[in-house]
Amino acid sequence: MLFPEAFQNLPAPAGPELFEVDRLLKGSGLLRLSRGGLNLWAVERQPAFLFMKKGGIDFYIKGGISFFNCRHLLMENIRPCGDGYEMEYEGTGQYYQPFGEYQGTNDWWEMDHSRRRTSGHLSVKVKATVTPVDDGFDIRVQTWGCPASTIRFEFGILPNVLIRGEGYRIPANAGGSLVATKGELELFDGKDTVSVGPGFAVNDVIKGLFGVGGPVQPLFQRRDKF
């Protein structure tokens, strides 16, 4: 260094809790945010559409849906909205009514399905909103459309993190899973903490739901379903 005295009065580098990033790469369908030491990446058209990291805590959020032939919540059109960003998904389909009379054959493939009445166009929409706050992000999900659709959000968490919730504390082991039926939970790696919730669920299915995609074995899965 030729002139060390020129750097003597510079302020100390900001810690990760003060480091802020806010960048939308619209052409690539990517969003990069950082607040309070928590980093977030949003990706369009991927089942795992949110990735987050704070210190040694790494996890993703993946969306699945049971709606006709739709199984993945593939978010699209990440865009600015108020103080944050939003993205959306729309699934469509139609239900074929029974024939109502014998078709002259028991072979499903030989039947004239153009004669069947349908329910008409049905759709379900999901909108996720990400708003930066002082110590992280406020993430909210809205759904509307076909009322009987079942939607799941899965949190995949790297091992060696302790999961603390109402009435339980368990390690995030590879291949493990739980359904958080109520309340908040914390992800704790011995140094940093990430709070998630509230969670809720209306069924007891833990694995093999919807065919959203095979679980990533090195990760622990936490699922919310509604």
Q: Where are these predicted regions, by residue range?
A:
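Beta-strand-rich recognition/accessory modules
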Residues: V179-F226
